[in-house]
């Protein structure tokens, strides 16, 4: 109804978490929504609950929105909650205040509770994790109060005056493939365990591929282009990757 009042055409896009699990399906979705936007049609994306497998459903709409923002190389992602943002204490404490900006790497463990928001399925912990991941990919993320009147208009027209928490985006470019991999851990088909030398190289600043000589053993069944978890010599997960052979 809102879009109709402004004569803006919209189109519903139904997706599932599995549709993000392969590169081909991922790109098909991106191309579909790109064409819609090029023709001035606003995509409204929802999970297709009728065919989604319970074990593979999105955690909440925050997770879905993060995937879409990353996939479409959005300029910004706005996540709405029932509070004004991330507080430096309990939101119920009159002495607490909203953290207006969060830089890359800032430790938020003292401020976030794993409780669910009454505004949706996801809690602030989920929102924060999604926000940090998307901001690391170069996209500005804003957490604001969805129960405030005209909150979206205020964020767009008066961004500095509107109370919210803004995650500062990374300045380092991230390729489309790496964005897809970053959000694909839930689709991992197996694990690749690597030795100490390969772990050190992988943890260096230089981007590298893992060669067979650095692999000690594998778990699960996977093939080319599948997503796998990367485990170090002590059994700790150190990354996620795409199989190239």
Q: Can you describe what each PLM-predicted range is?
A:
Residues 1-245:
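C-terminal catalytic "cap/lid" subdomain
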